[in-house]
Swiss-Prot record:
Binding sites annotated in the UniProt record for Mg(2+) 2: 307, 311
Reaction catalysis annotation: (2E,6E)-farnesyl diphosphate + H2O = (5S,9S,10S)-drim-7-en-11-ol + diphosphate
Motif DDXXD motif per UniProt: ranges: 307-311
UniProt name for this protein: (-)-drimenol synthase
Species of the source: Valeriana officinalis
UniProt xrefs under InterPro entries: Isoprenoid_synthase_dom_sf, Terpene_cyclase-like_1_C, Terpene_cyclase_plant_C1, Terpene_synth_N, Terpene_synth_N_sf, Terpene_synthase-like, Terpene_synthase_metal-bd, Terpenoid_cyclase/PrenylTrfase
EC number: 4.2.3.194
Amino acid sequence: MSTALNSEHETVRPLASFQPSTWGDLFISYSEDSQLKEVYGKEHECLKQQVKTMLLDVTNYRISEKIAFINTLERLGVSHEFENEIEGLLHQMFDAHSKFQDGIQHFDLFTLGIYFRILRQHGYRIYCDVFNKLKDSNNEFKKELKEDAIGLLSLYEATQVRAHAEEILDEALIFTKAQLESIAATSSLSPFVEKQITHALVQALHKGIPRVESRHFISVYEEDPDKNDLLLRFSKIDYNIVQMLHKQELCHISKWWRDSELETKLTYARNRVAECFLWTLCVYHEPKYSPARLLLGKLINIISCTDDTYDAYGTLEEVQIFTDVIQRLDRSSMEQLPDYMKILYKAVLDLFDEVEVQLSNQETNNTYRMAYAKEELKAIAKCYEKEHIWFRKCHVPPFEEYLENAVVSIGNRLAVTFSFLGMDQVAAVEAFEWAKTDPKMVKSCGKVLRLVDDVMSHEEEDVRGHVATGVECYMKEHGVSREEAVVEFYKRVEYAWKDVNEEFITPNHLHIDLLNRVLNLTRIADVVYKFEDGYTHPEKTLKHHIMALFVDPVPI
């Protein structure tokens, strides 16, 4: 190890001066109220059995009543308690749909919308021709639809799961959005309907973070004049019980962050422990994935620090050595690194050791999975290095060359593979081989994340000195303005979303729980980067969500 790399001699570093954490030590200590947890637990079990009875009873009802009840369970965030029962009902519905499609012609607009959306969100390929009945003889949407606010909202949410070559859904999105905006501005609506419309126009359900959307809907459902009080109370208790677990997990990761010295030794990097855990919670929030969440939460923090090391501190020589060391991933290589990088490299190795222990303790020894995660880490390091070299050389690459690298450096491929590690029962070797091939769904997820990130961050990164974002690359190559480039980016985002939706309903050998991880990663983009770079500047976009998820329980 040369003295030069360990010294603080004059070196030009592209310092970013990121904002400090909003949260301080808020999450580093968590004292669970065991008495309240016990009280909640007893009532939760009692209510769960009653809700399960209601769900089983609904099998004798009409399809419209079945799908409406499932919709309510999912919107309230309690469907994780009844996964098998719900899947059984949906399978029956889809089977009946395939044989007797005439019954759908009698669905009202609200029922048709939730029927289509929910079946697609569970991986069933239901065709968009079910909406043909909404058109008149002039191929326009029937005028009477404009009077049905809750039906229009249901159709609007259904359009969000559209895939390619579904023109009627593209048209329905334009139609419903215009009508809902008009209704919200001019009509006198009940609070129950008004809140749903106002929220949906900002955040579509399909593209939202599931746990965040459930918290919001619980408050909305309280104002439903036809609400089921038992179901409402069950959803509140369930939310608070699961929140206790999430608080405990965030506390664990906060302590790990402190003990790892990443915050104190890598002062140039973003301290975003709570924000990283929000990303983790979007990938999977269900209690059964708690061990997997702890590992993924640590990884996302480490990748954030690694990204900032390449972008906002490391010299060319340092990042080249770090990239080379990452290709080996052995402790003997640590001495080649400058002191500050040793902290980061140690965190990487310690995390992989922790993962290996957890995998070896599963019902079947799944340590083979480690090789896939390591390869993705090596790949992302090479992409970071390439971007650093571009920056040092003031090189603006052709857009497609930039994008090919950037959809890897955004980290979704590594996150997908890592999220599979802790899914003992459903993630067989085929799942890792699938992710390894960079399939269309994963690549499109990366495009959504990268393109919206670039749109929201490119001006700031240009000011502080950073590799050219996709916006600059596209502007230079095509000779267009920033505004024109942004329009093109959002067209590509819409196209990539259709890819994700299409792949989700395309039959393959993967369990739907695995595909949901990719879908959930795509959803992050629509929340974090909707109005600004919410990860770098979380106080406006993410602070409210973090308070709702990790600080404030639902009032009961």
